[in-house]
Curated annotation (Swiss-Prot):
GO terms for molecular function: DNA binding; DNA-directed RNA polymerase activity. InterPro entries: DNA-dir_RNA_pol_omega (IPR003716), Pol_omega/Rpo6/RPB6 (IPR006110), RPB6/omega-like_sf (IPR036161). The keyword Transcription applies. The lineage of its organism: Bacteria, Bacillati, Bacillota, Clostridia, Eubacteriales. It holds the Pfam family RNA_pol_Rpb6. The gene is rpoZ. Belongs to the RNA polymerase subunit omega family. The RNAP catalytic core consists of 2 alpha, 1 beta, 1 beta' and 1 omega subunit. When a sigma factor is associated with the core the holoenzyme is formed, which can initiate transcription. It catalyses: RNA(n) + a ribonucleoside 5'-triphosphate = RNA(n+1) + diphosphate. Its EC number is 2.7.7.6. One of its GO terms (cellular component) is DNA-directed RNA polymerase complex. This is DNA-directed RNA polymerase subunit omega.
Length: 72
C-alpha cells in the first residue's frame, strides 16, 4: 500500500480501474446512488457518499462493466 494521506490511494485504485476518467465516473455514479438511498455494500464509519463509494471500489464491492462507448 502507498504511504499517502488518502486511503485508499489513487494509485491503488488505478490498479483496479485502469484510467482516471473511468474511476471518477464509477465513483461519482455510485456516490449518487448512495445519496439517492442505495445501501452501502461495505461497513464503514464514514457517512460521506463519495468516501463510501471509493472504499467500495477498493474492496471490490461494486460491479461494473467497461464498454467501448464507456462505463455501464
Amino acid at each position: 500500500m502507498n504511504n499517502s494521506m488518502i486511503s485508499p490511494s489513487v494509485v491503488d485504485l488505478l490498479e483496479k480501474i485502469h484510467d482516471r476518467y473511468s474511476l471518477v465516473i464509477l465513483t461519482s455514479k455510485r456516490a449518487r446512488q448512495i445519496i439517492e438511498g442505495a445501501e452501502p455494500q461495505i461497513s464503514i464509519k464514514s457517512n460521506k457518499p463519495l468516501t463510501i463509494a471509493i472504499n467500495e471500489v477498493d474492496q471490490d464491492a461494486v460491479e461494473f462493466e467497461i464498454l467501448e462507448e464507456g462505463l455501464k
